[in-house]
Regions:
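Amphipathic, heptad-repeat alpha-helical segments
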Residues: 17-61
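A domain-start/cap signature at the N-terminus of enzymes
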Residues: 18-28, 74-145
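Gly/Ser-rich "nucleophile elbow"/oxyanion-hole loop immediately N-terminal to the catalytic nucleophile
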Residues: 136-142, 193-225, 235-241, 283
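Active-site machinery of serine-nucleophile hydrolases
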Residues: 144-211
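Mobile cap/lid helix-loop segments that gate and shape the active-site cleft of serine hydrolases
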Residues: 153-167, 239-287
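Short beta-strand immediately N-terminal to the catalytic nucleophile in serine-hydrolase-like folds
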Residues: 220-222, 247, 292
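C-terminal catalytic histidine-bearing segment of alpha/beta-hydrolase fold enzymes
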Residues: 292, 296-395, 401
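Solvent-exposed alpha-helical segments and adjacent loops
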Residues: 396, 407-653
Length: 653
């Protein structure tokens, strides 16, 4: 992360005028001789990889090829030293490929610094991560290992070459005893939001495949931008971890930026509730957290504002201070922080707490251990569930802005008596439901209608907002997606040129900022498997894009050669274009997106705190205003669909 002064400068520019800051920035010129050597090395490694595609350790080799390929093709060598590092990666990748060809994979049994990779569900790209494997590790040892996830700070030049090389040289800030430390790449520099958030969970799942993990001793830690990552991940997924230790960073957008001139749109103000950790402070009731700051570091602001929000929830934030220091750890503070964190880790996570305090603003984040919010009364208003197991046959819960809730206690939870029915007090209403099963598990689903709670029926076929199907537009890029390229003639030339430009930009930006090659197919090539497994990003209009033509009649927008109609509003089709997210009428378990990639643009690149969702569920873009580094054009209308994916007269304000 950049120093605060530079971050504030970026915000000022962002507020006053569009700023075009490319990320990554253009690299240095690579001498022709080095280019030839690197290309030859890539070709040799690619030839070896061809015969290894079915090997389960294929990603552990492929990541070396991708790292060098991206740096070379994308002009992403930023220092002369990186050219040497790239050659080293090709050498190591070649050695690993040769080992796999012999049926060996020695790095899978190694201790110390190990780099590995996995294939992401989002775009099929290989993503790297680093490990510090303790010297006590052995594949034959019957032991479940504590895992500390470490989130790195910001570096605009942190390409895969630097990440992999550094992870083979540098053990990092903390190396707890008998602990596997997982160093996340996080798909570059995004403070673990969007695809960067998914990277953490995918990398952790990959670690689980290869190492025995103690599920009750997983911790999240990081510094600077990595501290921001920890605040985000921990606040939204509090009961997944034993402890959190954020250092510096940021915890929200507007107060961190301290720019009174910047006035967000009404929908941006609502969308901040997606990513602001401050809005989820109540969830730290479930998770021990210790914040670190240098006493002279302006980025103490993150912990200061989290402490304020936690105080409003009746909690006092534990803090460790580095004395007479700015943006760094002191040796003494590291010792104290390690002592405290290790004590919490030794105790481990309370897997099945009797009491849950949970807040959310969206069904994207709908679970806090055994409490699951299935439906909201209104997205982007605060929802709460305070639930408690009173005794072995009764549960009490109080809710706000919740339309449906489930209680799901898994095997061995054993909080309720299997020989007794359970009485549930839900917002003062008493309901008697079947008791726990003999494995200790218990599940009950409730839905509110006309102010009254009742046991809920299965409504899987009902069109409504639900977890992972709630928007906004950016949500489509947290799971498998395919960009669907139009092959027909556009309804209007201006719109056709704009959609092509925006599609090209989205593909380019995905590679640069989220480090993958966006899957792209012609509209004539979309298969049943694509419909079943992926969100479809439809570019063009109902005439140019055959898939869009198939679903158009079932969307809450009408689009002809003359007009775009959104409820009671009409926009000229010659100079307007809709962007939106909606359940795919051909497979309502997946999304379609019309004419949009992820929604923050270049003006957000000055500070990771600006890298947030910029557009809601839908918008109409006026193309008489050209795209800039903030918007795809003038936003003539925008809004959120209702809880049944219906168009609201208020636009969801």
């Amino acid at each position: 992360m950049k120093p605060l002064a530079l971050a504030l400068l970026a915000v000022t520019l962002c507020a006053q005028a569009p700023v075009n800051k490319p990320l990554p920035a253009p690299g240095i010129a690579v001498p022709e001789a080095d280019q030839k050597q690197l290309r030859a090395g890539l070709d040799r490694l690619a030839a070896k990889l061809d015969g290894l595609r079915k090997n389960p350790h294929y990603p552990d080799v492929l990541m070396f090829h991708k790292a060098v390929r991206y740096a070379l093709e994308g002009n992403e060598f930023f220092r002369q030293e990186q050219i040497f590092r790239a050659k080293e990666l090709l050498r190591i990748g070649s050695e690993r490929a040769d080992a796999l060809a012999r049926g060996e994979a020695p790095w899978t049994r190694a201790t110390g610094l190990v780099v590995r990779g996995y294939i992401s569900k989002i775009d099929g790209s290989v993503q790297p991560y680093g490990l510090v494997v303790p010297p006590t590790y052995s594949p034959e040892k019957p032991h479940h290992w504590r895992v500390d996830a470490w989130f790195h700070g910001r570096s605009d030049t942190l390409n895969e070459v630097d990440f992999l090389y550094d992870r083979m040289q540098n053990p990092g800030e903390f190396q707890p005893v008998d602990t596997i430390v997982l160093h996340l790449y996080g798909r570059y520099c995004n403070a673990s939001k969007f695809a960067g958030e998914v990277d953490f969970f995918e990398a952790l799942d990959d670690v689980r495949k290869h190492y025995e993990v103690d599920e009750n001793r997983i911790l999240v830690r990081g510094f600077s931008m990595g501290g921001a990552s920890v605040w985000h991940i921990a606040a939204h997924h509090a009961t997944d971890f034993a402890a959190a230790a954020p250092g510096a960073g940021f915890a929200e957008t507007l107060e961190y930026q301290k720019n009174a001139k910047y006035q967000p749109t009404w929908w941006e103000s609502k969308l901040y509730h997606l990513t602001n950790a401050t809005d989820y402070a109540a969830n730290f009731f479930e998770l021990p957290v210790i914040a670190y700051n240098g006493d002279q570091d302006p980025q103490r602001q993150a912990a200061d504002i989290m402490a304020r929000n936690m105080e409003e929830e009746g909690m006092t934030l534990a803090r460790v201070w580095g004395l007479n220091i700015g943006h760094a750890y002191t040796p003494a503070a590291k010792v104290e922080l390690s002592r405290m964190i290790d004590a919490i880790a030794a105790k481990g996570r309370n897997e099945w707490p009797k009491q849950i305090r949970f807040t959310t603003w969206t069904l994207k984040y709908n679970r806090m251990r055994w409490v699951v919010v299935d439906s909201l009364e209104k997205h982007w208003d605060r929802a709460r569930v305070d639930a408690e197991v009173i005794n072995d046959h009764s549960v009490k819960a109080k809710t706000a802005n919740v339309a449906a809730v489930s209680f799901e206690m898994g095997t061995a939870a054993s909080l309720l008596n299997p020989a007794s029915k359970v009485t549930v007090d839900l917002d003062g209403q008493s309901l008697t439901v079947p008791g726990a099963l003999t494995d200790g598990s218990w599940t009950a689903h409730f839905r509110k209608s006309n102010g009254k709670w009742a046991l809920a029926d299965d409504d899987a076929k009902v069109l409504r907002k639900r977890h992972d199907l709630q928007g906004p537009i950016d949500d489509a890029f947290l799971d498998s997606f395919v960009m669907v390229r139009p092959t027909g003639a556009p309804l209007n030339e201006t719109v056709g040129k704009w959609t092509k430009s925006e599609m090209d930009r989205a593909i380019h930006q995905w590679r640069g900022l989220f480090r993958g090659d966006a899957p792209v197919k012609d509209d004539t090539a979309i298969s049943d498997a694509d419909l079943a497994n992926s969100n479809l990003v439809l570019w063009g209009d109902p005439q140019s894009n055959k898939v869009l033509a198939r679903v158009m009649e079932k969307l809450p927008v009408q689009w002809t050669a003359g007009a775009i109609t959104l409820g009671a509003r009409t926009f000229p089709a010659a100079t307007s274009a809709p962007v939106m997210i909606y359940p795919n009428p051909l497979n309502p378990k997946k999304y379609i997106v019309i004419n949009s990639g992820f929604t923050f643009r270049e003006s957000a690149n000055g500070s990771n705190s600006w890298q947030v969702a910029e557009l809601p569920d839908y918008a109409v873009v006026d193309l008489t205003t050209p795209p800039n580094s903030r918007w795809p054009g003038r936003i003539a209308a925008a809004g959120f669909f209702g809880e049944k994916w219906e168009l609201l007269a208020t636009d969801g304000k």
